[in-house]
Amino acid sequence: MPKKMNKIRVLALNAAAVALCLLMLAAAGFAEGRSLDRGSSELGFWGGYSPDNPTAIGITTNRPFGELNLQYAWVLVARDNWALKYMIELVPVAVISQPRQTNVVQGNFLVQVDAPGTQRAIYGAGISPIGLQVNFRRHRTFQPYINGTAGVLYFTDQVPVSGSSQFNFAVGWGAGVQIWYRENQSVSLGYKFHHISNANSASRNPGVDSNLFYAGYSWSWKLRR
């Protein structure tokens, strides 16, 4: 197996270990709790990994994907039992594992297919300036949430196939739980359906979907007036 593929698997194992540590940390101090109030801010980070690719929107498979995000959030609305947050995320590191392409003859056509044994890591970075999250049970320690984000990613090579593009749009939506183990500190565990596509800006646009499982940490504050 290629060394870069091994690095991705090690990254996934490390992410799982971090998630377990965060969960244990939350369990150790879960009695503190937190109430999300309008105007409060959060700063944090999360990392996620997708070992496989569904084909709900994109049609490309065999593309394990992972990313590390830095996140800022601000509570826009706070009601009795829920709160709405605006989010912006920076993606300093994104990595997708994809094989090289080779040309084969199928009938009267020359088509590109994945070349076996050529899996390699392609790195990228980006930003998601559009993001919303709704936290339920906003006065409780364990707060389920749903969220969605939209942004762009730029890779060092064409993704997810040759003839596509280094520049891709990225959208994602999902759910999770935010655990306030201290009044101003929390960990999050969640799932996000993630899709990247060049929106037909290149000759090929098969798109790629990911089942992104992630864990994160955030620190919250509210300026006093």
Q: Where in this protein do the model-derived segments appear?
A:
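Short glycine/proline- and aromatic-enriched beta-strand/turn motifs that initiate or cap beta-hairpins
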Residues: 29-76, 210-225
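Gram-negative (and chloroplast) outer-membrane scaffold detector with strong preference
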Residues: 66-158, 218
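Transmembrane beta-barrel strands of outer-membrane/channel proteins
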Residues: 41-51, 86-94, 146-152, 189-195
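Short loop/turn motifs that connect adjacent beta-strands in outer-membrane beta-barrel proteins
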Residues: 31-41, 76-85, 137-144, 181-186, ...
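Predominantly the C-terminal beta-signal and adjacent terminal strand-loop region
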Residues: 34-39, 176-225
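Residues that define the transmembrane beta-barrel architecture of outer-membrane proteins
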Residues: 39-41, 62-68, 121-128, 142, ...
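Cleavable N-terminal export/targeting peptides
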Residues: 1-37, 222-225
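Extracellular loop and loop/strand-boundary signature of outer-membrane beta-barrel proteins
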Residues: 55-59, 113-119, 157-163, 199-205
